[in-house]
Design a protein with these regions (language model features):
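Membrane-interface amphipathic segments in extracytoplasmic regions
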Residues: 1-227
Length: 227
């Protein structure tokens, strides 16, 4: 997470959207008064194009009481509602099906093909685990100015950089990781699992229309409370 007082923006970091690389890019434009939370073990998952720079330019500072994947509601309460309203608040999301598939390939990167890795994954992981709604939706509705689309990353960052008066040269320096390698088990998502994912991400789809899963209609209430 980043709270930049110098450029007046807040970046909330969701999961499985390349958030570490986004955080790295934005942190380079932060000053000494800004909050930049540590990313810990996530540093080893930075794309190779950024690993050489990591640790030399990014500064983890002023982060006491803040955490990397922090709830937007808690961050707003700590920052103050007045400043939150003044700052440009942003985060990124991705299609829920793509998000679950990404987690499967990430978690099973070193798993043997023996047995059924897909079944094992679904036995231990439920779709709602990846819901990040509580980071940018509160009981009062959406609390951020922008939920960028991971699949339109460069377009989103062009808008962000223009708003923050940051130089942008067409990309932020990384591309989505390809966890699936030749010969690995394919993660097939059938109608039943698609519906389960749609139910788990019903709240997100209510506020971020492009997160709705085509061909499904969530049967659970989308009014669950944000944490």
């Amino acid at each position: 997470m980043i709270i930049s007082h110098s450029r007046k923006f807040v970046f909330l970091k969701n999961r499985k959207v390349g958030g570490t690389s986004m955080e790295f890019f934005l942190s380079k434009y932060c000053s000494g008064e800004d909050v930049v939370t540590p990313i810990g073990e996530e540093a080893k998952f930075l794309p190779q194009s950024l690993q050489a720079e990591f640790g030399r330019e990014i500064r983890f500072q002023n982060y006491r009481s803040f955490f990397n994947h922090y709830s937007g509601v808690k961050a707003r309460d700590m920052l103050g509602h007045d400043l939150w309203a003044q700052y440009y608040t942003l985060t990124f999301e991705r299609n829920p099906v793509s998000k679950v598939r990404s987690l499967f390939y990430f978690n099973t990167a070193d798993v043997s093909e023996e047995g059924d890795p897909v079944a094992d994954f679904l036995d231990t992981t439920y779709p709602g685990y990846l819901s990040d709604a509580f980071r940018y939706i509160s009981n009062d509705g959406m609390i951020v100015d922008l939920v960028g689309n991971y699949d339109r990353l460069n377009e989103g960052f062009e808008t962000i950089c223009r708003r923050l008066d940051i130089s942008f040269h067409g990309e932020i320096g990384f591309q989505a990781k390809g966890w699936q390698s030749a010969g690995r088990k394919e993660f097939t998502i059938g109608p039943t699992l698609r519906q389960e994912i749609a139910d788990a991400f019903a709240l997100e789809a209510e506020f971020v229309p492009w997160m709705a899963i085509e061909g499904t209609r969530p049967i659970c209430s989308a009014s669950r409370l944000a944490r």
